[in-house]
């Protein structure tokens, strides 16, 4: 019984003392793996989360337009880079993969432009529908072009 209790205390001590260190090592490794596309996608995701909350509110159109502009700039920057998943593909398929990725980003940017026009026109019903389309394009793109975590 004493040995069992001592083992529990030993394991608990290691977890309490070593756990934070292990977490910081993992976080540092994750930071090293951050790509330019990943940084831009993070910017887009933060803006998109906020935009989904505001899209239907006509009183928030100015803020919504700023969020769309942030997403558009991040999308345009991300489109300039090659997804990390391309490195896992055979050389013969990389160019087509990258071209398809850029085409999908252009499609996303096109929907963002439509969304900006809807906000400028005060058409929040259309804006809410376009936010749904953006979500669909985002999900499809992530399935096809994002490297699994």
Residue ranges and their predicted role:
Residues 111-149:
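C-terminal amphipathic alpha-helix
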Residues 39, 43-46, 50, 66, ...:
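Charged, amphipathic alpha-helical oligomerization/scaffolding segments
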Residues 84-120:
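Long, amphipathic, charge-rich alpha-helical segments that form helical bundles/coiled-coils
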Residues 1-10:
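Bacterial Sec-dependent N-terminal signal peptides
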Residues 16-26:
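C-terminal segment of classical bacterial N-terminal signal peptides
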Residues 52-89:
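Alpha-helical segments in soluble extracytoplasmic regions
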Residues 62-69, 95, 99, 128-133:
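Short, charged, amphipathic alpha-helical segments
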Residues 26-67, 148-149:
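Immediate post-signal-peptide N-terminus of mature secreted/exported proteins
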